[in-house]
């Protein structure tokens, strides 16, 4: 269901219901981790399952639809708006590290933290909850940028290593999106058994992802994080300044409310888990990166509902 097409009172109730569902799922994940019903092995395994299996299945299922010029044009617009978002966040990030005089050892972490949000792991489930399958369809076009930039610009920010073309091309999110685009533009009808299987697998993404985020927050050590004001300011840039600039720009142009809403919501996603993964991979400040991801994720439980209520 596309929220922007619902009447005022029903819209407000629908948004409230979806936000409540998110809180319930994350809260349940937090609780079952605290009582040790799940362990680190489960959360790591679930993370891999989401990245390599359920998210690609969700994307492919959403792309199996009849080709229309309207959908294709909207997908192209969403793709271009994704580029705009990354340009805006990059400018914000570089201004931030310059004004705050961030040291060279931490600069790459802060830049990555602000530029790259959790647009896949959290973004797709939020799009599914808020907009239904069409939200996932459009988000796939939007996330082409992430899948390319994270293995090009992202690697450059965290390391002096050369960009790995192999890792770029074997990225499961990019592969699923490109295959889905081919399926859509060539109007390939997947067999009903395949489509149903993809849908069933993809439908597990939302609860799994929310559980893992809840478990992630349950394991977080906030004592040292709360003392770092730079992390708060970086989270402010990521969760508030970036989305507000997108709101100002997009609400000044003539586009459907859904096409406006998707890039704005995606711009408000917290720092991606890849921030910590890349920091560890390239011997950067892993502790700082982890604290940034935890803090922005925790704060997004406040900012994302507010953002959804403002724009939908």
Locations of regions flagged by a protein language model:
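Alpha-helical transmembrane segments of multi-pass small-molecule/ion transporters
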Residues: 1-312
